[in-house]
């Protein structure tokens, strides 16, 4: 049986760990609230912009914008969004595995698949497994629209220069604290959705022309989609870390209980042994 001193040392160590996990849970909860508010605010804007773009795109020839042109798909770019830090359960591992599945499934379709990573964990996992086109580090800690727009603009420039023919983004979409959905979205080329099935579709008067608006809104649409995906990932990360730290704290409490019971039994056994020795010694003196 382990000594009383070693058991007590383990109890102190686990208690210290529990303090850390509880603190991390509280920090993640505070960050999650802010991140969740950002996601909720971004979703309606992204949806409405997509609707406006859809109306414009339906009445335009796709050859009018390079971002809508369908061409022979030979090269693809996959943007993989993970976190910069760990201790968030399977958040990063699940995304990285999904990225590997995508690459494996699309190998026959594309001659070349490049990967852009957002977040240190994804880069560290994929750098020895796949060609990394670029890594964006330290973007998510203080996420801003200009940072997301820069990523989107560099991606658009590469697409126009025909460095790749299709662009996808893979991220964790935020559903709830306990649930994050791995989501794959195709960013480029932009395909106008099928015409509305509604009997009455209102006509809009656009100023300036539809072509000018489309040229302005297409890049903006990509920027917004990238920004929303990053916001979703940040909220998902905090939710996953909060859940993981809560689970770790509960496990630590359970372990402390088991170690305390073990300590009490060991202490009781030691006291019993001492008493037996005292009694034996007393009997020897009497004899």
From Swiss-Prot:
Pfam families reported for this sequence:
ATP-synt
As for subcellular location, the record says: Cell inner membrane
Q: Which GO terms describe its cellular component?
A: plasma membrane; proton-transporting ATP synthase complex
The topology of this chain with respect to the membrane is:
Peripheral membrane protein
Keywords from the UniProt entry: ATP synthesis, Cell inner membrane, Cell membrane, CF(1), Hydrogen ion transport, Ion transport, Membrane, Transport
Q: Which domain of life is it from?
A: Bacteria
CDD domains per record: F1-ATPase_gamma
Q: Which Gene3D superfamilies match?
A: 3.40.1380.10, ATP synthase, gamma subunit, helix hairpin domain
- Gene Ontology annotations of biological process type: proton motive force-driven ATP synthesis; proton motive force-driven plasma membrane ATP synthesis
List the GO molecular function terms: ATP binding; proton-transporting ATP synthase activity, rotational mechanism
Subunit structure, briefly?
Answer: F-type ATPases have 2 components, CF(1) - the catalytic core - and CF(0) - the membrane proton channel. CF(1) has five subunits: alpha(3), beta(3), gamma(1), delta(1), epsilon(1). CF(0) has three main subunits: a, b and c.
Q: By its UniProt entry, which HAMAP family does this protein fall under?
A: ATP_synth_gamma_bact
- Give the UniProt family note: Belongs to the ATPase gamma chain family.
Purpose? Produces ATP from ADP in the presence of a proton gradient across the membrane. The gamma chain is believed to be important in regulating ATPase activity and the flow of protons through the CF(0) complex.
What is the name listed in the Swiss-Prot or TrEMBL entry for this protein?
A: ATP synthase gamma chain
Per the UniProt record, the lineage of the source organism begins with: Bacteria, Pseudomonadati, Thermodesulfobacteriota, Desulfuromonadia, Geobacterales
């Amino acid at each position: 049986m382990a000594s009383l001193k070693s058991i007590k040392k383990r109890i102190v160590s686990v208690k210290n760990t529990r303090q850390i996990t509880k603190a991390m849970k509280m920090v993640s909860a505070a960050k999650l609230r802010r991140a969740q508010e950002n996601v909720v605010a971004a979703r309606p804007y992204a949806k409405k912009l997509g609707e406006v773009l859809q109306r414009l795109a339906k009445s335009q020839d796709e050859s009018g914008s390079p971002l809508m042109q369908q061409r022979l798909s030979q090269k693809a770019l996959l943007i993989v969004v993970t976190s910069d830090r760990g201790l968030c359960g399977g958040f990063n591992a699940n995304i990285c595995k999904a990225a590997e599945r995508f690459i494996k499934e699309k190998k026959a379709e594309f001659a070349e698949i490049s990967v852009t990573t957002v977040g240190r964990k994804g880069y560290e996992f994929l750098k020895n497994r796949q060609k990394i086109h670029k890594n964006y580090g330290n973007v998510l800690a203080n996420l801003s629209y200009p940072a997301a727009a820069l990523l989107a603009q560099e991606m658009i420039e590469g697409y126009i220069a025909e460095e790749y023919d299709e662009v996808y983004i893979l991220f964790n979409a935020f559903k709830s604290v306990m649930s994050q959905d791995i989501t794959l979205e195709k960013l480029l080329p932009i395909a106008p959705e099928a015409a509305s099935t509604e009997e009455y579709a209102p006509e809009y008067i656009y100023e300036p022309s539809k072509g000018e608006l489309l040229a302005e809104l297409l890049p903006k649409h990509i920027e917004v989609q990238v920004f929303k995906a990053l916001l979703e990932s940040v909220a998902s990360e905090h939710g996953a870390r909060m859940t993981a730290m809560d689970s770790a704290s509960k496990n630590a409490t359970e372990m402390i209980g088991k170690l305390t019971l073990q300590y009490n039994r060991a202490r009781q056994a030691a006291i019993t042994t001492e008493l037996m020795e005292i009694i034996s010694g007393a009997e020897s003196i009497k004899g």
